[in-house]
Design a protein with these regions (language model features):
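Short, small-residue-biased leader/transition segments that mark boundaries at the very start
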Residues: 2-4
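Short glycine/acidic-enriched loop and turn motifs that connect beta-strands
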Residues: 10-13, 79-82, 140-142
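Blade-edge beta-strand/turn elements of extracellular beta-propeller
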Residues: 22-56, 91-114, 160-170
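Short coil/turn segments that connect the beta-strands within blades of beta-propeller domains
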Residues: 70-72, 129-132
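Disordered, acidic Ser/Thr/Pro-rich linker "stalks" and the adjacent N-terminal cap
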Residues: 177-242
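A short beta-strand element within beta-rich, extracytoplasmic domains
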Residues: 243-252
Length: 252
């Protein structure tokens, strides 16, 4: 067995790869090889900025490799973890250290909208039933530039459409399969709709800038905060009519 190491986290340097010897302190065998160069001039999703508008190079980072049907998918993230447009792309090759070919429908993992955005710096893995999933970083970036959460997305690996993560309805509950599932054909959504969005809301108290209306505006970057952390503080939402409630999701 060979042990291969990929590295890179830079707005200048490329994603690199090298074989290492685990029996000798993971010493490099040979010289590191450049695997992915920066290509902001070719691939707009690698351009940094809230809407990919900044005149600079993005950060290519978080490389990992998935082997599927004898081919190697070299995954990487761009352009920066603080953006909702943060995503993951693929290069594909026949050898673990390349050469690799860019996949034209990149990014394969991308979620700029919804309650929480971002789907980059991730890794694709297979569960015990043979289903592929992608776990990725999602941004908040309010209290700290790198304030994040993790998202989990089902992945389709298709002969026709290649590899892509299903992020469209990722804000809503889905069931975790206990069998092999064709995500391209079978919907694992629970089918539950959002009931609380911008409904009438009140609270026992609030801090300025953290009003109760910010608790159900479907933006992870805003929230309600009571004046104290004492018992007895409360938040109330009026749905306007009797509704069936299947689940309550609290984000904190």
């Amino acid at each position: 067995r060979r042990v291969l190491f990929r590295l890179g986290c830079s707005d200048v340097d490329p994603i690199m790869g090298v074989e290492v010897d685990p029996k000798d302190g993971f010493r490099a065998i040979g010289e590191p090889k450049a695997l992915i160069q920066h290509n902001c001039d070719k691939y707009g999703w690698e351009v940094p900025g809230k809407n990919n508008e900044e005149p600079s190079q993005g950060w290519n980072e978080g490389p990992c490799v998935l082997k599927h049907n004898g081919r190697y998918y070299l995954q990487y993230a761009a352009p920066g973890t603080q953006y909702r447009i943060y995503g993951d792309g693929n290069y594909v090759g026949d050898n673990p250290l390349g050469p690799f070919e860019y996949v034209e429908d990149n990014p394969f993992s991308f979620k700029p909208g919804g309650f929480i955005g971002g789907a980059g710096h991730g890794h694709t893995f297979k569960d015990k039933y043979g289903n592929y999933w992608h776990v990725a970083s999602m941004t908040i970036s309010v209290r700290h530039w790198f304030e994040r959460r993790l998202g989990l997305f089902p992945v389709v690996v298709s002969e026709k459409y290649g590899m892509y993560a299903l992020t469209t309805f990722a804000d809503y509950p889905f069931w975790i399969p206990d069998r092999k599932v064709d995500f391209e054909k079978e919907d694992i959504s629970m089918g539950w709709n959002l009931l609380s969005y911008k409904k009438k809301i009140s609270s026992s108290s609030y801090l300025e800038g953290y009003e109760p209306e910010l608790a159900n505006d479907e933006q992870v970057e805003t929230w309600w905060a009571a004046q104290t952390g004492n018992a007895g503080e409360w938040l109330q939402i009026d749905l306007g009519k009797t509704m069936e409630v299947n689940a309550i999701q609290v984000n904190f």
